[in-house]
Regions:
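Divalent metal-dependent catalytic cores for phosphoryl transfer on phosphate-bearing substrates
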Residues: 46-47, 57, 70-185
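Acidic/His-rich, divalent-metal-binding segments that scaffold phosphate/diphosphate chemistry
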Residues: 2-100, 110
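Charged, low-complexity surface segments at secondary-structure and domain boundaries
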Residues: 9-10, 134, 200-204
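Generic alpha-helical secondary structure signal
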Residues: 22, 32-35, 39, 76, ...
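Non-transmembrane, amphipathic alpha-helical segments
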Residues: 50-53, 138, 211
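Terminal helices and disordered tails flanking the catalytic cores of nucleotide-processing hydrolases
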Residues: 154-240
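Long, highly charged amphipathic alpha-helices
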Residues: 64, 106-107, 214-218
Length: 240
């Protein structure tokens, strides 16, 4: 049962208007409070030297999560929930990087209730957010699995804030070496492949494995949850 349409406000108290029922991805993405949370989370991470986690990242994750769900035959509404989870998945970083997935889930709970989302859908979204981080999360539902795959696939040089630091920071170096990344979902073969184009003059493939092995394991587990296998392809060569 849906809540009545909710009237919501911007951070400065300005009325935003009634949220649609069912709640849409577009409404969540464009809401001033959501955009503020995303911006502040990214600003906090910038202060401690992390790669970009702002609107570019969450926008890409939302689109990929939606596409994963649809290509794997999941209903349109569940794909919308994956996109909403993608928009909100990193807002917990505005509080602290540690346990940001769980913190973000609780923040999303308050936002989505204010927006009038149906309770079962809220629980689906916040459990996905709370489980998206590779160190302490699991694909507890389809939305979580799609979110994990989408989040871990965003490796690209555009995420590096200061290219001058790539000599000193392995995470920046590996991200900067990636010229192209694409999550290829083969719905017929039920196989999901992360395809990367890496400049070996900047970072060796082994450095990628050194820092992203846990992400690859999380991606494999997520693919299995969706009934697919997972693989990694680098510069046209299948590695996993």
């Amino acid at each position: 049962m849906n809540h009545p349409s909710a009237r919501t406000t911007a951070p400065d108290g300005t009325p935003v208007g009634e949220a649609p029922s069912p709640l849409t991805f577009e409404y969540v993405r464009e809401h001033p409070r959501v955009r503020l949370y995303v911006r502040m989370a990214d600003a906090a991470l910038e202060q401690i030297g992390y790669t970009e986690h702002g609107e570019r990242h969450v926008g890409l994750v939302s689109r990929i999560a939606y596409n994963v769900m649809r290509r794997m035959g999941r209903p349109e509404r569940m794909a919308d929930l994956a996109a909403i989870a993608g928009t909100l998945h990193d807002i917990g970083n505005s509080v602290n990087r540690d346990h940001h997935a769980q913190t973000g889930g609780l923040m999303a709970l308050m936002l989505l209730r204010d927006f009038g989302m149906q309770e079962e859908e809220i629980l689906t979204v916040i459990s996905a957010i709370g489980n998206h981080h590779e160190n302490d999360g699991d694909p507890v539902n389809d939305v979580a699995a799609a979110l994990i795959l989408a989040d871990k696939s965003d490796v690209h040089r555009t995420r590096v804030r200061n290219p001058d630091m790539i000599k000193f920071d392995i995470h920046d170096r590996v991200n900067y070496a990636v010229e192209k990344s694409f999550l290829n979902v083969d719905e017929d073969q039920k196989h999901i492949t992360l395809e990367l184009t890496i400049d070996p003059k900047i970072s060796h493939v082994m450095e990628y494995f050194e820092i992203f092995m846990t992400r690859m394991l999380a991606s494999r587990k997520a693919a299995l949850h969706l009934g697919a296998t997972f693989g990694l392809q680098v510069n046209g060569n299948r590695l996993v």
